[in-house]
């Protein structure tokens, strides 16, 4: 049965408009994105099929172009649309982050860093550069490593902090394994960067590790 033949109260789009997006399941949200189904499957049926194939909504959203476009009911146009939606979401978070102090908006900081790093298949190290009022100046990815590790050079971090006239920084990197627990090497690198940046009067406010779930704040655990 086509979704158009469903009672209005059960149709995903109508329910979203009436009750808000939060009331919908992953399959229903994906069905709205898909708009139409395929022969023998409504958009909701197709969405459920795709979620089973990928294992989760996150894995579907982070799939590369080749993997995505090979799936039933998907293609280059849908992939382009998805990338546009994801980029708009990242830019929305970036705008929210730039409007006020990062310390006043810790949840936005977490969401932004998660959107920037969680999809990376290899370990990536980045930095949020902040002004004297802890407003975000810019975000930069500084180092990229293998799937297991990355080499972080304090001299390069200092160089970029000076280039942006930063007064403070928030460090971040991802764990492609999904486990957010900091390794001994993570703690060593954090201490080295703290010591190096202190020489130019730049404070390290936090170091976030991005994996599955919410990013881990080393500052909250007393490791900074």
From Swiss-Prot:
Binding-site residues for Zn(2+), renumbered to this chain: 173, 175, 186
Protein name stated in the entry: UPF0758 protein PFL_6051
Biological source species: Pseudomonas fluorescens (strain ATCC BAA-477 / NRRL B-23932 / Pf-5)
MPN domain segment(s): 102-224
Keywords: Hydrolase, Metal-binding, Metalloprotease, Protease, Zinc
GO molecular function, one term: metallopeptidase activity
A Gene Ontology biological process term: proteolysis
Family named by the database record: Belongs to the UPF0758 family.
Top-rank taxon: Bacteria
InterPro entries referenced in this protein's UniProt entry, alphabetically: MPN, RadC_JAB, RuvA_2-like, UPF0758, UPF0758_CS, UPF0758_N
UniProt cross-references to Pfam families, sorted A to Z: RadC, UPF0758_N
Motif JAMM motif: positions: 173-186
């Amino acid at each position: 049965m086509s979704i158009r033949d469903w009672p209005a109260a059960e149709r995903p789009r109508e329910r979203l408009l009436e009750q808000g997006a939060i009331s919908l399941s992953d399959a229903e949200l994906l069905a709205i994105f898909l708009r139409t189904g395929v022969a023998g499957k409504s958009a909701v049926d197709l969405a459920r099929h795709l979620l089973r194939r990928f294992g989760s909504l996150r894995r579907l959203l982070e799939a590369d172009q080749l993997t995505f476009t090979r799936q039933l009911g998907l293609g280059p146009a849908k992939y382009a649309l998805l990338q546009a939606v994801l980029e708009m979401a990242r830019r929305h978070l970036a705008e929210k982050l730039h409007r006020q102090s990062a310390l006043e908006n810790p949840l936005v900081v977490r969401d932004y860093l998660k959107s920037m790093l969680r999809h990376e298949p290899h370990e990536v190290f980045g930095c949020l550069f902040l002004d004297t009022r802890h407003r975000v100046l810019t975000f930069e990815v500084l180092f990229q490593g293998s799937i297991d590790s990355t080499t972080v050079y304090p001299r390069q971090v200092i160089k970029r902090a000076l280039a942006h006239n930063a007064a403070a920084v928030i460090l971040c990197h991802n764990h492609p394994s999904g486990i957010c627990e900091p390794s001994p090497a993570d703690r060593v690198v954090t201490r080295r960067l703290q010591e190096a940046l202190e020489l130019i009067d730049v404070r390290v406010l936090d170091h976030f590790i991005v994996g599955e779930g919410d990013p881990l704040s080393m500052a909250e655990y007393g490791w900074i």
